[in-house]
């Protein structure tokens, strides 16, 4: 590819309706079972045929496995501790899905 001078590049970007987003800290791509986190990326927005195309480049990449808590686990914690649905779910999330830890945490504060 031939090198382009900055003026030509700027003109081409304007013709293609391209612009770069500044100050982007991270981009998170959420999948069903995990998240891909791209830190300090370069993000370019291209408008083509009425659609916006986001091009993400570079940065550090990190994957996080998404915690999946089953309804059965939430119900079990509710039955064992007498708490409501949201409290049981939150306790399981804080315990990374560990049933025993969630139940102990909720019952430790009880008389």
Curated annotation (Swiss-Prot):
The gene behind this protein is nac
Mention one GO biological process in which this protein takes part, according to its record.
protein transport
Record organism: Pyrococcus furiosus (strain ATCC 43587 / DSM 3638 / JCM 8422 / Vc1)
Q: Does the keyword Isomerase apply?
A: no
Gene Ontology MF annotations:
RNA binding
- HAMAP family xref list: NAC_arch
* Name the record gives this protein: Nascent polypeptide-associated complex protein
Q: For this UniProt entry, which residues form the secretion signal?
A: none
Classify the source by domain of life. Answer: Archaea
């Amino acid at each position: 590819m031939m090198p382009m001078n900055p003026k030509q590049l700027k003109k081409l970007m304007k013709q293609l309706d391209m612009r770069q987003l500044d100050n982007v800290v991270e981009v998170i791509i959420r999948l069903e079972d995990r998240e891909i986190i791209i830190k300090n990326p370069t993000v370019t927005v291209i408008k083509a045929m009425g659609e916006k195309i986001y091009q993400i480049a570079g940065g550090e990449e990190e994957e996080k496995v998404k915690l999946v808590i089953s309804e059965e686990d939430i119900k079990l914690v509710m039955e064992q501790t007498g708490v409501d649905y949201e409290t049981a779910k939150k306790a399981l999330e804080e315990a990374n899905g560990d049933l025993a830890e969630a139940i102990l945490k909720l019952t430790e504060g009880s008389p």
